[in-house]
From Swiss-Prot:
EC numbers, comma separated: 3.1.3.-, 3.1.3.48
GO CC field: host cell cytoplasm; virion component
Organism field: Vaccinia virus (strain Copenhagen)
Assembly and binders: Homodimer.
Name by which UniProt lists this protein: Dual specificity protein phosphatase OPG106
């Protein structure tokens, strides 16, 4: 087995078939200005202690937040194993990086705050990685977020796409 195949096998094996984690209900601060949450967290964003400048909505449903100055960016994504989420990684990670640099808080969410939004957050954190071992960093981030939130990027296709872009292609 070549090195890339081995890495992919180990990463997918160590993050799959785990005990079923419960869906998160709380919003999680990922970096100084990037937050991960679910649909309810987005609906509560206008009254949040965090003064969000943006909400990145990754559900299929478009909405507005009445009486709010929050800018909503909508990228409609289906949470299934056929969705090519990787085509959005570069744009979303660049946007989240700008939010962090400009001190503009952003909430990234999908319906449950697990797969679509979790994948974008994992891609963002992987894009910031300056470590020499992307495989170890992936496992560290994945398991740290799972410890914090419970369920996190359970969709095997989304996980595979992140591994291919940020781990396999980096080696």
């Amino acid at each position: 087995m070549d090195k890339k195949s081995l890495y992919k096998y180990l990463l997918l094996r160590s993050t799959g078939d785990m005990h079923k984690a419960k869906s998160p209900t709380i919003m999680t601060r990922v970096t100084n200005n990037v937050y991960l949450g679910n649909y309810k967290n987005a609906m509560d964003a206008p009254s949040s202690e965090v003064k969000f400048k943006y909400v990145l909505n990754l559900t299929m449903d478009k909405y507005t937040l009445p009486n709010s100055n929050i800018n909503i960016i909508h990228i409609p994504l289906v949470d299934d194993t056929t969705t090519d989420i990787s085509k959005y990684f570069d744009d979303v990670t660049a946007f989240l990086s700008k939010c962090d640099q400009r001190n503009e808080p952003v909430l990234v969410h999908c319906a449950a705050g697990v797969n679509r939004s979790g994948a974008m957050i994992l891609a963002y954190l992987m894009s910031k990685n300056k470590e020499s071992s992307p495989m170890l960093y992936f496992l560290y981030v994945y398991h740290s977020m799972r410890d914090l939130r419970g369920a996190f990027v359970e969709n095997p296709s989304f996980k595979r796409q992140i591994i291919e872009k940020y781990v396999i292609d980096k080696n």
